[in-house]
Amino acid sequence: MRTPIVEKVIVHMGVGESGQHLVNAEDILRNITGQEVVRCFAKRTLPAFSIKKNEPIGCKVTLRGQKAQEFLETALGIVEKTLNRSQFDSFGNVSFGIEEHTDFPGMRYDPNIGVFGMDVTVVLKRPGERICKRRIAARKIPAGHRVTVDDAIAFLNESYGVEVM
């Protein structure tokens, strides 16, 4: 009951512009994860980057269950199973980047598409966290039941062999 589990893995590509560049990123993300891609939109206008509000500028995929486990194993292998302690937040979640999509098995470089990087975010939880999200009789999670940084590091080390610097 106390061991953390992987709730979800979010894979995000921030392209910074709409058009063919974003479509290429969506195709790459769809091929890597095998799941449908969702577009991300700009929250505000940034004239310095010529980005308008509500313009599509990125894409993401949320993986859960067995797909999340398999993708996480592959992604951690790409970063050589080493993470930095600063990549963990206070809730035990971890985020890391992958510089090139060509590092994934089965992906090759295409000069027409280019090279894309991506961010991977792993959300950890303990069984029983639903009590704070349910509509009826919602309760706060006690501090002892929350996932801490040390719990997350121990879980990733034990389950995936990750070394934290």
Curated annotation (Swiss-Prot):
Q: Which GO terms describe its cellular component?
A: cytosolic large ribosomal subunit
MF annotations from Gene Ontology: RNA binding; rRNA binding; structural constituent of ribosome; tRNA binding
Top-level taxon of origin: Archaea
Q: Name one Pfam family in it.
A: Ribosomal_L5
Q: Which InterPro entries match?
A: Ribosomal_uL5 (IPR002132), Ribosomal_uL5_arc (IPR022804), Ribosomal_uL5_C (IPR031309), Ribosomal_uL5_CS (IPR020929), Ribosomal_uL5_dom_sf (IPR022803), Ribosomal_uL5_N (IPR031310)
What biological-process GO terms show up in the record?
Answer: translation
The protein's matches in PROSITE patterns, at most eight in alphabetical order, are given as: RIBOSOMAL_L5
List keywords of the entry alphabetically.
Ribonucleoprotein, Ribosomal protein, RNA-binding, rRNA-binding, tRNA-binding
Q: List the disulfide bonds.
A: none
Any keyword Ribonucleoprotein? yes
Chain's role: This is one of the proteins that bind and probably mediate the attachment of the 5S RNA into the large ribosomal subunit, where it forms part of the central protuberance. In the 70S ribosome it contacts protein S13 of the 30S subunit (bridge B1b), connecting the 2 subunits; this bridge is implicated in subunit movement. May contact the P site tRNA; the 5S rRNA and some of its associated proteins might help stabilize positioning of ribosome-bound tRNAs.
Return the similarity comment.
Belongs to the universal ribosomal protein uL5 family.
Q: Spell out the subunit comment.
A: Part of the 50S ribosomal subunit; contacts the 5S rRNA and probably tRNA. Forms a bridge to the 30S subunit in the 70S ribosome.
Q: What is this protein's record name?
A: Large ribosomal subunit protein uL5
Q: Which organism is it from?
A: Methanosarcina acetivorans (strain ATCC 35395 / DSM 2834 / JCM 12185 / C2A)
Gene behind the chain: rpl5
